[in-house]
Amino acid sequence: MKSDSIKKGPGKAAQRSLLKALGLTNEEISRPIIGIVSSQNEIIPGHMNLDKITEAVRKGVLMSGGTPLVVPTIGVCDGIAMGHEGMKYSLVTRELIADSIECMVKAHAFDALVLIPNCDKIVPGMVMAALRVNVPAVVISGGPMLAGKHKGKDISLTTMFEAVGSYENGTMDEKELCDLEECACPTCGSCSGMFTANSMNCLCEVLGIALPGNGTIPAVFSERIRLAKKAGMAVMDMLKNDIKPRDIINERSIMNALKADMALGCSTNSVLHITAIANEAKVNMNLDIINDLSSKTPDLCKLAPASNIHIENLYAAGGITAIMNELSKKDILDLNCITVTGKTQGENIKGVTVKDYEVIRPIDNPYSENGGIAILRGNLAPDGAVVKRAAVLPKMLVHEGPARVFNSEEEANTAIFDKTINPGDVIVIRYEGPKGGPGMREMLQATAAIAGMGLDDSVALITDGRFSGATRGASIGHVSPEAASGGMIGLLENGDIISIDINNAKLEVKLSDEEIKRRKLNFKPLEPKVKEGYLSRYAKLVSSASEGAILK
């Protein structure tokens, strides 16, 4: 056992004395030591219940003969951080989380890990750490929030952000806004649509690093507690059978995850995170593979924000295993990939069926023959840009209009709320990339305001920043290279004609080669927005969004 390095033999008497200071008996010390990494806190609704998940995992480990020891890690609530300086500190925590777990595992020689995240960056950060330390590991999340109810309709956090736009536009009064506020987020759990947190929790099932049910069992269901106990038991079986994260997450399982991503219509952030996870798994991932997979993978689900269907409905319809089984009917997935159950994906999904074809479309009658995410390229994004095609109105799949250029999210939001954006405009928000932000903020406040003001059928938005999974509309992010690195987005001027063709994966600015060359000669990037602290260090080390915004 790895933990023998801190407990075996006369030379480790001092270390054993410290373990006994924890209250551990000789019997407990002699067993495998299982690190339980919990991101429980009292600021994220999706993490407030993780103490209960942690206790259930502990029981599962104990039932199977291990000694569980709980260690913490940080987490940011993207919704609370949205629309202000705080959003600069969201994506950057992914690397902090991965690094801190690596430190704890290596320093204390844990034999195996159970990782307990729930929301946006915490999930990929923990998966990245699992691959890096490569000891047996299981991910068990806290589960999705139930949808809110208002006047007989299901609502979510997207409803709230868009309601702010409606209020600013004068189409909603303050009483209605406050009524929505009271019921949009009714329970603990990750926000109720196919936003980033739920996207990643669902994709953990497909990667094989989480048990079936991880992505969709609601946070408030007792079944979630039972699943957590099973996770604690499963990691002990993995330790016994020497199954490690790099045995599970490899090129084949990553391709499975990308295909499921297409079928589910996941958040565009999933592209960023899967790319970063692939890097930790030593898998070379080119963004162009996404369009290739999208052309072969139908879109089977339209979940919020693309519709009013939520994760609880996906759970009732059969969950991720049902979607995988549907995809398997056309041999889209590699079902021979091993998982944390010790079985293959094919064995895991055997006998599972779709219970509601209104939620999960049959493979022969999809919403679209193409997947939910597209990579765009062109002179405006030679290294790629990402759009959630499944959440774009059909009339906006092809759009051409004049650029309205802003050097920060705040500038753009002011223009939107001041009602100076016209139908047909293409809002450009730059210097919000991994380096330029720094931290690659999400533009949910801007996109939600556009939708709330009724402009989502005529206005597009492009940025070198990111979008929340709660964003809908012609919102194109991750434009690479970013402005701070001299990318074309930094050369744009008000009035430049932007051409968007999502059907043909194109993103262009209509300028002559001579004009582009002239602008490049005169280009001077803005001064760094942050010159001290963690963000300053991050900006110096972070890679392009096209590489997953990993640190190098």
Swiss-Prot record:
UniProt modified residues of type N6-carboxylysine: K121
The protein's annotated catalytic reaction(s) are: (2R)-2,3-dihydroxy-3-methylbutanoate = 3-methyl-2-oxobutanoate + H2O; (2R,3R)-2,3-dihydroxy-3-methylpentanoate = (S)-3-methyl-2-oxopentanoate + H2O
Active site per UniProt: S468 (proton acceptor)
- Cofactor: binding details: Binds 1 [2Fe-2S] cluster per subunit. This cluster acts as a Lewis acid cofactor.
PROSITE patterns under this entry?
ILVD_EDD_1 (PS00886), ILVD_EDD_2 (PS00887)
Question: Which GO terms fall under biological process for this protein?
Answer: isoleucine biosynthetic process; L-valine biosynthetic process
Q: In which pathway does it act?
A: Amino-acid biosynthesis; L-isoleucine biosynthesis; L-isoleucine from 2-oxobutanoate: step 3/4; Amino-acid biosynthesis; L-valine biosynthesis; L-valine from pyruvate: step 3/4
Describe its function: Functions in the biosynthesis of branched-chain amino acids. Catalyzes the dehydration of (2R,3R)-2,3-dihydroxy-3-methylpentanoate (2,3-dihydroxy-3-methylvalerate) into 2-oxo-3-methylpentanoate (2-oxo-3-methylvalerate) and of (2R)-2,3-dihydroxy-3-methylbutanoate (2,3-dihydroxyisovalerate) into 2-oxo-3-methylbutanoate (2-oxoisovalerate), the penultimate precursor to L-isoleucine and L-valine, respectively.
Family designation: Belongs to the IlvD/Edd family.
The protein in question is named Dihydroxy-acid dehydratase
Record gene name: ilvD
